[in-house]
Swiss-Prot record:
The keyword 4Fe-4S does not apply. Interacts with PI4KB. Interacts with GBF1. The keyword Mitochondrion does not apply. It comes from the Eukaryota. PANTHER family: ARMADILLO-LIKE HELICAL DOMAIN-CONTAINING PROTEIN 3. InterPro entries: ARM-type_fold, ARMD3-like, ARMH3_C. SUPFAM superfamilies: ARM repeat. It is a single-pass type I membrane protein. The chain crosses the membrane at residues 520-538. This is Armadillo-like helical domain-containing protein 3. GO terms for biological process: regulation of Golgi organization. Its main location: Golgi. Belongs to the ARMH3 family. The gene is Armh3. The lineage of its organism: Eukaryota, Metazoa, Chordata, Craniata, Vertebrata.
């Protein structure tokens, strides 16, 4: 037994002697994790530390391996390391600055990771010490601001932004991240704007800058005055707003391109041939294979810009060559982390006005068109939670746009016509529309097409009621503008009317299932009131008198659906159930639709009998309608052109808190600090002796 122990001892000694030597930086980290001040024995300790290549994994792992008590014992050394990192940011040698930035990232992440399981110490105290926190963070933010605004290294700017993203997203709920109080006090808003307004910086760092801004805007936005919200709402510099728009356009365009590539690859493959052979039984499965990860972070940035800054609305309509049709000039690919599809922008800014001029042969586009295409992809499939959130946010953004007077002006402008190829969900009963046959029309037509497309493709068991309500509200707000400004839009209104009637039919045929989960009468009332808008005010905004005739024809043709709806709501409004009041509102709203049906149906039957015709053509019905308008009596209904304006704080706060939490987690997961190798940095900073 003693011999075995001896052998074991010898073996241990032998294996220990073969153990690789620790790199010097790791030995220095180990000294920091002792209770003694490492600079006592080595006065140049901190100076030397920042010349060493950072070992992020070791530093973070070491912090996570200690329990709360052990960490508190070395608190002074951690504070000292944090302060020396901040001091190193002011050094002339860029290598020191880079190492200090990376060390700060490791420190912040390591201490926060520790805090998840041990809440017995405060993070600010652990990193900086309560007494020095204010000055430390002031110095840190000032250094980061200087580095971001300087004309120096793009690699340093990239690391500064990554450190800030690390700082912001280190907790899932950013509003619980107390360190951000110092980021509010020591604002870097102007530095972010400078990046966005300066084309070279925007090309390299625009995406990170926009995501950072979107997250900072959401810090305790409902509890206190957030300076980033205040400042973003008053930005009026054209170059800055356009820069932000370009970054968002690029990111959404990249998503659209990836989706289109996947779609084409899928259609040309074996599975497509198999689908054609056996019919459409695989359509749903095939469609799900086309899923590309959504980009909620950039969508949130677009929402905040549209919602907070009225000047940004002009950026939506800024024309530029369509990104998919333009070849970007050759340029080195910036060092960005490998992230999932749809989460990173293209590598170069292909729409700088300096680099590209508009060509008459090239299809022009703008941010709104890119966004509508993005929405048409995301809103196809709402079964997945991320896509459901993205679809909801798309509709919220469209709601804000539909309420804005200036946005409506360019949406309805006859002189701003575009061909917008929206993505349509594969369905058995319809063929894929040929993109080339699409006419150039005002942009509001594409918005209405998108709403109609959503209405007809989501009548399913898992009914997305919230999205339907928002969709119908967008249509209503657009109609209110058309009525108010007497805009006669040349649109195929019949498609909208047909979609709305089919939606009513769906609600009625699934009454029992839907009523168990939803108040279907709110949606039914909104649909009926859309028809009331057309009936009451259609003569002021429908393109031609014949369009108004077609409205009546459609109501008369589908009278059975309206009769069934009336029977259903009458039944529920006369019972003493929970739906009594909601159903009675629909009953009252149907008064004019029922008046039209009851007025014209006998006249049509009489016309058919007199002329011995068993089935009247559309033109014959329209002839009867035109001849009998004079004797029709309708009731004037109030408030049809009124609506409640969008309000985030009261109705959407829970949604945005959850969305920002999801974005924060995703950004943190995809943050990479190893994108810059030490060799690449040494090459860039070749001035170092």
């Amino acid at each position: 037994m003693a011999q075995v122990e001896k052998r074991g001892g010898l073996l241990r000694k032998s294996s220990a002697s073969k153990k690789p030597l620790k790199e010097k930086v790791v030995l220095m980290y180990d000294e920091i994790f002792m209770t003694e001040d490492p600079s006592k024995c080595s006065p140049r300790f901190w100076e030397e530390l920042f010349l060493m290549k950072v070992n992020l994994e070791y530093l973070e792992g070491k912090l996570e391996s200690l329990d709360g008590e052990e960490l508190m014992k070395i608190k002074d050394n951690i504070n000292c390391l944090f302060q020396h990192c901040i001091q190193a940011l002011g050094e002339e040698h860029p290598i020191r600055v880079v190492n200090a930035l990376q060390t700060l990232c490791a420190l912040i992440r390591g201490v926060h990771q520790k805090n998840k399981s041990t809440s017995g110490f405060d993070i600010i105290n652990m990193l900086m010490g309560f007494d020095k926190a204010e000055l430390c963070m002031k110095n840190l933010m000032e250094s980061l601001d200087s580095l971001l605004c300087a004309e120096g290294s793009e690699s340093l700017k990239s690391l500064c932004l990554k450190l800030l993203l690390c700082l912001v997203t280190v907790t899932d709920n950013i509003s619980q991240n107390t360190i951000l109080e110092y980021v509010m006090i020591n604002s870097i808003f102007e530095a972010i704007l400078q990046i966005l307004s300066h084309p070279p910086s925007r090309r390299e760092h625009g995406y990170d800058a926009v995501v950072l801004l979107a997250l900072l805007v959401n810090y305790r936005k409902y509890e206190s005055v957030n300076p980033y919200i205040v400042k973003l709402s008053i930005v009026d510099d054209e170059a800055t707003l356009n820069g932000m728009g370009l970054v968002i356009t690029q990111a959404l365009s990249e998503y659209n391109r990836q989706y289109k590539d996947k779609e084409e690859e899928h259609q040309s493959g074996f599975f497509s041939a198999l689908t054609n052979m056996v019919g459409s039984m695989f359509i749903a499965d095939a469609h799900e294979k086309l899923s590309v990860q959504t980009n909620e972070a950039i969508l949130l940035a677009l929402y905040e810009a549209v919602h907070l800054n009225r000047n940004f609305i002009t950026v939506l309509a800024q024309s530029h060559p369509e990104m998919g049709l333009v070849t970007a000039p050759a340029s080195p690919t910036p060092t960005t982390p490998a992230t999932p599809l749809g989460t990173t922008p293209p590598s170069s800014d292909v729409i700088s006005s300096v680099e590209l001029s508009l060509d008459a042969d090239v299809q022009t586009s703008n941010l709104l068109i890119t966004f509508l295409k993005y929405s048409s992809i995301v809103m196809q499939d709402t079964k997945d939670e991320h896509r459901l959130h993205s679809g909801k946010l798309c509709l919220i953004i469209l709601t804000c746009i539909a309420e804005d007077q200036y946005a409506n002006a360019f949406l309805h402008d006859d002189n701003m016509n575009f061909r917008v190829n929206l993505h349509r969900m594969p369905m058995r009963h319809r063929k894929k529309a040929a993109d080339k046959n699409l006419p150039c029309r005002p942009l509001v037509c594409a918005v209405l097409d998108l709403m109609v497309e959503f209405i007809v493709t989501h009548m399913m068991k898992e009914f997305p009621m919230d999205l339907y309500l928002r969709c119908v509200q967008v249509v209503h707000k657009l109609l209110c503008y058309q009525k108010k400004c007497r805009v006669r839009l040349h649109y195929t209104w019949r498609e909208l009317w047909s979609a709305l009637i089919n939606l009513l039919k769906f609600l009625m045929s699934n009454e029992t299932v839907l009523l168990a989960k939803h108040n279907i009468f709110t949606l039914a009332l909104m649909i009926v009131n859309l028809f009331n808008m057309f009936i009451t005010y259609g003569d002021t905004f429908l393109p031609t008198p014949s369009s108004y005739d077609e409205l009546y024809y459609e109501i008369i043709r589908m009278h059975q659906s309206f009769d069934n709806l009336y029977s259903m709501v009458l039944r529920l409004s006369t019972n003493a159930g929970q739906w009594k009041e909601a159903a009675s509102k629909v009953t009252h709203a149907l008064v004019n639709i029922r008046a039209i049906i009851n007025h014209f149906n006998p006249k049509i039957e009489s016309y058919a009998a007199v002329n011995h015709i068993s089935q009247l053509s559309e033109e014959q019905v329209l002839e009867v309608v035109r001849a009998n308008y004079d004797t029709l009596t309708l009731k004037l209904q109030d408030g049809l052109d009124q609506y409640e304006r969008y309000s985030e704080q009261h109705k959407e706060a829970a949604f945005f808190k959850e969305l920002v939490r999801s974005i924060s987690t995703n950004v943190r997961r995809n943050l990479a600090f190893h994108t810059l190798s030490q060799e690449a940095l040494l090459k860039e900073f070749s001035t170092i002796s």
